[in-house]
Amino acid sequence: MPKFAANLTMMFNEVPFLDRFEAAAKAGFKYVEFLWPYDYPAQELKAILDKHGLKVVLFNTPAGDVNKGEWGGSAIPGREADSHRDIDLALEYALALGCPNVHIMSAVVPEGASREEYKQTFIKNVRYASDKYKPYGIKIQLEALSPEVKPNYLLKSQFDTLEVVELVDRDNVFVQLDYFHAQNVDGNLARLTDKLNGKFAHVQIASVPDRHEPDEGEINYQYIFDKLDEIGYTGYVGCEYKPRGETVTGLDWFQKYK
């Protein structure tokens, strides 16, 4: 049975971020994920996690200057020092929070820039992260973002991500399989799951096309959950969706998994 993690950046947004941990626990979640923890001291977050009996299972490296169109910086040529700083900061938080996975964000590729140069820069920075994280058993996740959500992102398809994972060639670097993005770009999710089996170590879900609860839209998530059980997937399933209304009202789908 899947181990579901509430995404606290997107869910329970009826209350401030630090109050979402309690809300998730009351709703029956044992695991949480979020995009970025860096606005808060790690020890404060750890105390809140412990208070509510929660485990954080994933967060991202810093996004960079979002106001300038950045969305990650680990693929930007000439910014390797910044990338290493972000990777090191994420490691500090992962160790303090006991988080087993970190998503290393690549970057948006500007019009006219060389995607190959960005890719090679990303590969080098991910190898740096791999060496830093390996002694602690922390897994590195790389994620494709569909063009509808993030135009010109370096990784668009699950196969873009798989290519980078294979070129990095380290045993602690994996595909982060977000079925929302995968359906938008790749489709054929059952066969995709088989093709990526053993290469992905974190899953995220949301309906397509509206990115709501996983009980509507194009994807038959019960089939996907059964497929994950069939292949022996033991990682976490992050609920990275935008609730249709109040978060708790939309959790009927989750009741049988508590």
Curated annotation (Swiss-Prot):
Keywords from UniProt, A to Z, are: Carbohydrate metabolism, Isomerase, Magnesium, Metal-binding
Looking at its record, which EC class is this enzyme?
isomerase
What is an example of a GO molecular function annotated in this UniProt entry? Answer: hydroxypyruvate isomerase activity
Q: Which GO terms describe its biological process?
A: glyoxylate metabolic process
Show the coiled coil region(s): none
* Function of the molecule: Catalyzes the isomerization of 2-oxo-tetronate to 3-oxo-tetronate.
> Protein name, please?
2-oxo-tetronate isomerase
Q: Which organism is it from?
A: Haemophilus influenzae (strain ATCC 51907 / DSM 11121 / KW20 / Rd)
